[in-house]
């Protein structure tokens, strides 16, 4: 490859952003370059965590940088000489990690006394149901479960308060019991769980019984209003909804229905990394519900496996106000999950043989999970790397 002028290299940022339809534009590509410069050698997941950009987007940008000679072919990856020169031209050479060394920027550190809780939750997770990616599920790690309980403690909800979990595939209800058991203190006066999955509810029931933990379980499709017996009953709520604006509106509406009347009720809301325009829609839904943001922690939630996130998500601490009200009083009938809204296909590359396949609505595989389950049709292997969106 011939040497390029600094100006032509900088112009590559715009080309890469356009190639992957990056909502963050040149600044998003610049952030990814800076992260590779600071963290090298770095896996895609670490770059996603540092930049806050979705994992598939970071992977697609990485492939575009490789094709232009800015990023090496090895994994974990580092910038090439040309990439380092571009980083210098952009002024992003500083190698400094300002995150807290103890909590890693998560604000909440798990004390050593709760290491036992983490280990117990890992064992409980191993016996539990798998994530259902069609429902936008990605199971959070045992450490994240404990941090969520600690977040409820920091918010003043626990000990002594009541908590409604709108969807609990992450088993936070169980985590409340395990943490309380390890500390020797009953944490919640009441824990309510509303979930559509009987598998999840059965697992919670079995585990809670062994812990002598009382959990109020309700099998319920959240497209329908919250059951009357749960309305207006809880001090606080927690939800990790489908990763769409519609999912935000519906699940937070059901949380609001379950809270006791009054301002300053706590809601802990988890969500995955999305582009700026999608995040704007999500935050507009939150404001539309009459909720205000009391705090936000990036990368607070870490997820296992290969679900819709396969990485990290933020925790947003919300408070109710005098104007807080559900936006979905009756039955909800619109799109809810990512698969119901996705109209563009994305190309995926088999790591084993480099064959490429479109995935998405109208393709042979509706999701990368379907492709992964089937295996590469060319070599039978995998795994698969996300590439750019297929042009319409």
Predicted regions and their residues:
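Nucleotide donor/acceptor-binding cores
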Residues: 160-161, 189, 265
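Conserved SAM-binding motif I beta-strand of class I
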Residues: 187-195
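A short, conserved alpha-helix within the catalytic core of class I
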Residues: 244-255
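C-terminal substrate-binding/active-site "lid" region of AdoMet-derived donor-dependent transferases
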Residues: 253-307
